[in-house]
């Protein structure tokens, strides 16, 4: 079952039960314009609520654009896992075209405490040749998720 809420998140989030949400999918204000609605919401208050309502293996997914992407990522390095790039077919923000390039992508930041269910979307392609996952040591260069909290302490 999907429940959608429309309103101020700082009013709605406290009404949700603890550990009741599988996915938080959010497009917060980025604070990149002078518009009243584009004010950055206090991230510490949001994280307090998101961590309370999200199940232990729930995911918190945010759309963002620079410089907000960096602010958002730095606000919760402990739970930041990866970033996707949302490539757009046409650049946006034409009002600033004379002073900066059009924005052709947005960032999608994924946070979680415990690995959520992940169902990879496969596509048809030609298999790699010359090595296999059983003989390749490429996976050994990546650190585990637990290492992220070690980075926090330095």
Q: What are the residue ranges of the model-derived segments?
A:
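Core catalytic lobe of class I
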Residues: 1-149, 153
